[in-house]
């Protein structure tokens, strides 16, 4: 479910909400695995807005991981600061 319809005002509000959150998904030395994607999906289903911690010092690799993770989970990258990502995906209200 793409969330391209978020305005900059919405993104600012989500950033403010995310400020107090702790990372619930940790991506380690093995990078983006199917287990990490599944765990991210579970957390997005439960919380809508989550923080993800990405290990490693290579900035380009962290950006690539963020893009791949967003594509795999149909989430939107709200913020990327250092090794922290903030992802958002609206809850499915059809269920």
Cite the ranges covered by each PLM segment:
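Positively charged, polar, low-complexity stretches
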Residues: 2-95
